[in-house]
Design a protein with these regions (language model features):
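Sec-dependent N-terminal signal peptides
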Residues: 14-23
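Sequence/structural signature of beta-propeller domains
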Residues: 27-215
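Short, basic, low-complexity termini and linkers enriched in Ser/Thr/Gly/Pro
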Residues: 1-10
Length: 215
């Protein structure tokens, strides 16, 4: 039974990677596509915001700045659709949403930045990069989102340490995928020049059960 579950999770990880490759590599190699640039205005245009992660919560695209600044951004799907598939050429102004977290810069030694964000219902999961002069680590934080205001709250105690597979400066777990009741964490790089045996981490919702799955 356990082996069947492991195989199923592996298949889902491979499927996610396959979908990513399908969308990042066009099958029509001879046709050149022109990117459609969208106009974005407001605070998010400031390069210091450094958007590091994003995920959909219902019909809202939530964008996570890497800095500890107390807010995230949200763009409605309808706003994106009207500009990508319609004739709307006006500027999108992402809405600032409260992001309530502890002061990790004081609470967590080596706190560097927020990296990834993912939603499972009203639950929200984030990775926090921990950076020292000669080592790296990562924390998985768990919180919740208000379905009406979109305000995100992360309690101080909901942290799980997830060790990096190897030391590469400024590299940590920067992608999260939800798989039913588990969170799949992917390291920033998985090439064999840096990691001999790359793997994904499957973490349960409470953060007390972590399983490695080879990639």
């Amino acid at each position: 039974m356990q082996n069947d579950k492991i195989k199923m999770i592996k298949m889902k990880i491979y499927f996610v990677l396959l979908i990513f490759l399908m969308f990042s590599c066009s099958t029509e190699q001879t046709i050149e596509r022109t990117p459609k640039l969208l106009k974005i205005g407001g605070l998010i245009k400031n390069s210091d915001e450094e958007i590091s992660g994003m995920d959909w919560y219902n019909d809202n695209l939530i964008l996570l700045p890497e800095n500890l600044n107390g807010y995230v951004f949200a763009i409605k799907k309808s706003e994106l659709d009207s500009r990508i598939n319609g004739n709307d050429t006006t500027t999108i102004f992402p809405k600032q949403i409260k992001f309530n977290t502890p002061n990790y810069s004081e609470l967590v030694p080596g706190f560097d930045s927020f990296e990834a964000i993912a939603f499972r219902g009203y639950e929200v999961y984030l990775t926090i990069e921990i950076r020292f002069a000669d080592s790296m680590s990562c924390l998985l934080a768990r919180g919740h989102i208000d379905e009406k205001t979109l305000e995100i709250t992360v309690p101080e105690q909901n942290l799980t340490v997830i060790d990096v597979p190897t030391y590469v400066d400024n590299m940590s777990y920067e992608s999260l995928v939800i798989d039913e009741d588990r969170v799949i964490a992917l390291f920033e790089t998985n090439g064999d020049s840096l990691i001999e045996s790359p793997y994904a981490l499957s973490i349960n919702s409470s953060g007390n059960d972590i399983i490695k799955y080879p990639l």
